[in-house]
A protein has these predicted regions:
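A motif-centric feature for acidic-aromatic and gly/ser/thr-rich catalytic loops and repeats
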Residues: 2-12, 153-196
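Short, small/polar residue-rich loop motifs at catalytic or cofactor-binding pockets
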Residues: 4-5, 19-21, 68-70, 89-91, ...
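A residue-level detector for well-ordered beta-strand positions
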Residues: 8-9, 25, 74, 95, ...
Length: 196
């Protein structure tokens, strides 16, 4: 909790988060988050369902909206893997997995990113736009903590992580900082990082 009174969020059956200061959370009968609904309309480009659309969406998801019916929609496969996210602006992000449950593809806005794994550690990622855009990730031995990023054009970056293994900074070959993020004590970004 972020307040002394512990009133900044509420939990429901199964200890599921049902609301916080920004969202109402809706779940399906299997406990999967299916909709994260804005409490207020502060997000630019939000698509708000009107009348019949809102009722149809409530029926389809098996939920009852508590505010405007605008927010993030999550669709799940029968095996519990996230298959699709529909953003508040209506744009869709879709995912595909291999037989071991590892994400092998993410598609958004006409770009598809592919992932290759070494056991449970991501090894390569690339987009379909060009062959020379392969990215190789190196991890600390026997951990999930990223240590470096190698790009096909010859760029390489060292990654500095915090004590939990969360990447906090990245440096190029010359030792110049090229990326940084800062988190508050709840893990939210204080300073939004640039793309890395």
């Amino acid at each position: 909790f972020e307040t002394r009174e512990r009133d900044d969020r509420r939990y429901g059956a199964g200890s599921r988060l049902t609301e916080d200061r920004d969202y109402f959370y809706h779940y399906d009968c299997e406990g999967n988050l299916v909709f994260k609904e804005f409490r207020t309309l502060d997000w630019a480009g939000v698509s708000v369902p009107l009348g019949g659309q809102k009722a149809h969406l409530e029926e389809e998801l098996g939920i009852t909206f508590r505010a405007f019916g605008a927010g993030w929609r999550y669709d799940w496969q029968s095996d519990g893997m996230l298959s699709r996210v529909i953003r508040p602006d209506g744009k869709e992000v879709s995912f595909a997995y291999d037989a071991l449950g590892r994400r092998i593809r993410k598609s958004f806005a006409g770009t598809t990113t592919h992932f290759v794994w070494d056991g449970n550690i991501p090894l390569h990622e690339w987009t379909e736009e060009a062959e020379e855009n392969v990215v190789t990730w190196l991890f600390e031995q026997d951990t999930f903590v990223p240590a470096a990023k190698l790009v096909a054009n010859g760029e390489c970056f060292s990654i500095v992580s915090d004590y939990l293994g969360t990447p906090m900074q990245a440096y190029d070959k010359q030792g110049d900082k090229v990326w940084e993020q800062e988190l508050d004590i709840y893990g939210r970004q204080r300073k939004r990082p640039s793309a890395f």
